[in-house]
Amino acid sequence: KRFQESITMAYHTFHGVETRIVRIFNTYGPRMRLNDGRVIPAFIGQALRGEDLTVFGDGSQTRSFCYVTDQVEGIYRLLLSDYHLPVNIGNPDEITISDFAEEIIKLTGTTQKVIYKDLPVNDPMQRQPDITKAKEILGWTAKVKREEGMKITYEYFKSLSPEELAKEEHKDFSKYIY
């Protein structure tokens, strides 16, 4: 990722190419792939299958999640700007993975347990964007609260048949865009 940013900056500096660099953080929403290895699709998939939720590590690591419509709005504003340095687009509201697992259980109305497994090597303890530039330069902040976005996301996946749920991609998203 850093190499790509360096190449982009070089094209801007040496060739005058109009560029934008966006750093996105944990985007989620309807139509995401349930098998992509990230925590939201993993928890939703496990909940829908009636499986216990798997937390890697002790669950104290934190993440922040940005609903897809907020992410798109931030990227759009960056594209309309003339700012060529990196800008973080994400929601800085953090939650521990353990607390998030409990939120998913509450959201789904199920009785699954949370099970803990060894933390993968190099898994960050915190992933929270500093969105100061997005606020100052783009006038952007995330608007959709995690609870609201997760409800929309869960309801989308809950509405799918088992066959649709098993698909790699989900094409119909018209009713989930604000």
Region annotations inferred by a language model:
Residues 4, 8, 43, 101:
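Aromatic/hydrophobic pocket-lining residues that form π-stacking "cages" and hydrophobic walls in ligand
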Residues 1-5, 37-38, 65, 94:
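Short-chain dehydrogenase/reductase
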Residues 17-38:
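Flexible, glycine-rich beta-alpha linker
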Residues 1-20, 48-49:
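Active-site Tyr-X1-5-Lys
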Residues 26, 47-178:
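C-terminal substrate-binding subdomain of Rossmann-fold SDR/epimerase-dehydratase oxidoreductases
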